[in-house]
């Protein structure tokens, strides 16, 4: 007598459940079906043959055990959706503000000692890639998943990141920190423009009013500025444009690839690129010939501190974006800009002129209005 066991199943993952978390065997996938209520069930054809019945009972028992594991995992709270404590948010926001200010102030101080932006970037990026590599070496949770050979598929990401960071650094080299926020004041308008052109995202009237206020702050700050060379303002506008391209273009890569892998590959390649460019432009040669003694020691010490701050800034920024809302993030950016301007006056001996004060205020108020308006639109749309 012959008998036939029929297993009819299709697996559909539960809501908010990653199917990869529960794939233990191919048999487990081939023997489950999800009904309209979202509960898994098994279907077997009946047979009078004792051997078939024994096989059927054995398979059923194993499947029921696997299903119990699935249901238990489904009932577990999602750690990503769990409420974040206020203490965590406070440390994330405060750390991002502190390290961002440190990076800007220390970079400007290093450039005041030795005007070698490419050499500085090369060292910082090499330091960052080394720190990420050491973290992977001693971590039991995170491991490297992408190799440097993957750079070919990340060429657009690497290009826009290098372009954006080099532009920002050269802008900082030609303008004082107290004017840095104003010189890059067109970042928000450029981002809105590129989002419309590339992503077809439209901006309503109220958020656009905040954008107009930002443009007014930029125009007011630049129009009455007589202490900054035109090249600094031009680099500020160019830096705003390249940063806007960066913010719009890299979203795809951030969601598709692990963050640490992107940081490592980008930092390693940018370090080599900036070093080669420093050699080709004779920046490295002039630095070696002209810098000696205590000047070189001071530059190296500041460079170490800025590189360490830059590494922690990457971690703090990603953490803040993860645990806070866009409104909280933009408010922290505004607070950082004000503190950064005041610290530039206190520690770098810069002068805060009237046009810079009004320009920064208009840019920050416009940015906050735009952010609050967009957040209101988001809540209305999701209601």
UniProtKB/Swiss-Prot annotation:
One of its GO terms (molecular function) is triose-phosphate transmembrane transporter activity. GO terms for cellular component: Golgi apparatus; Golgi membrane. The lineage of its organism: Eukaryota, Fungi, Dikarya, Ascomycota, Taphrinomycotina. It is found in: Membrane. The chain crosses the membrane at residues 87-107, 112-132, 157-177, 179-199, 205-225, 228-248, 262-282, 299-319, 329-349, 352-372. This is Uncharacterized transporter C22F8.04. Residues 13-24, 46-55 have a biased composition (Basic and acidic residues). SUPFAM superfamilies: Multidrug resistance efflux transporter EmrE. Belongs to the TPT transporter family. The keyword Transport applies. Residues 1-55 are annotated as: Disordered.
């Amino acid at each position: 007598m012959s008998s036939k066991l029929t297993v009819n199943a299709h697996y559909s993952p539960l809501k908010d459940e990653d199917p990869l978390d529960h794939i233990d065997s191919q048999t487990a996938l081939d023997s489950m079906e999800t009904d309209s209520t979202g509960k898994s069930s098994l279907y077997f054809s009946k047979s009078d043959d004792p051997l078939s019945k024994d096989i059927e009972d054995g398979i059923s028992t194993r499947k029921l055990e696997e299903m119990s594991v699935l249901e238990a995992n489904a009932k577990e709270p999602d750690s990503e959706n769990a409420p974040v404590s206020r203490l965590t948010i406070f440390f994330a926001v405060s750390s991002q503000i502190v390290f961002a200010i440190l990076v800007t102030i220390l970079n400007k101080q290093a450039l005041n000692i030795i005007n070698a932006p490419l050499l500085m970037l090369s060292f910082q990026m090499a330091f960052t890639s080394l720190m990420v590599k050491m973290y992977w070496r001693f971590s039991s949770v995170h491991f490297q998943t992408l190799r440097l050979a993957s750079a070919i598929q990340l060429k657009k990401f690497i290009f826009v990141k290098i372009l954006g960071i080099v532009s920002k650094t050269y802008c900082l080299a030609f303008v004082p920190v107290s004017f840095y926020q104003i010189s890059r004041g067109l970042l928000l308008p450029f981002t809105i423009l590129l989002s419309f052109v590339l992503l077809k995202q439209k901006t309503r009237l109220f958020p656009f009013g905040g954008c107009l206020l930002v443009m007014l702050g930029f125009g007011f700050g630049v129009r009455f500025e007589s202490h900054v060379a035109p090249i600094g303002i031009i680099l500020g506008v160019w830096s705003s444009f390249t940063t806007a391209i960066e913010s719009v273009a890299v979203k795809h890569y951030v969601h598709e690839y692990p963050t640490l892998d992107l940081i490592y590959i980008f930092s390693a390649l940018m370090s080599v690129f900036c070093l080669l460019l420093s050699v080709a432009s004779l920046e490295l040669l002039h630095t070696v010939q002209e810098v000696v003694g205590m000047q070189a020691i001071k530059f190296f010490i500041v460079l170490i501190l800025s590189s360490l701050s830059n590494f922690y800034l990457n971690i703090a920024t990603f953490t803040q974006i993860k645990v806070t809302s866009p409104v909280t993030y933009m408010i922290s950016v505004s607070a950082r800009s004000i503190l950064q301007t005041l610290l530039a006056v206190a520690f770098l001996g810069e002068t805060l002129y009237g046009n810079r004060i009004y320009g920064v205020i208009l840019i920050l108020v416009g940015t906050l209005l735009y952010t609050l308006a967009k957040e209101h639109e988001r809540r209305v749309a999701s209601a």
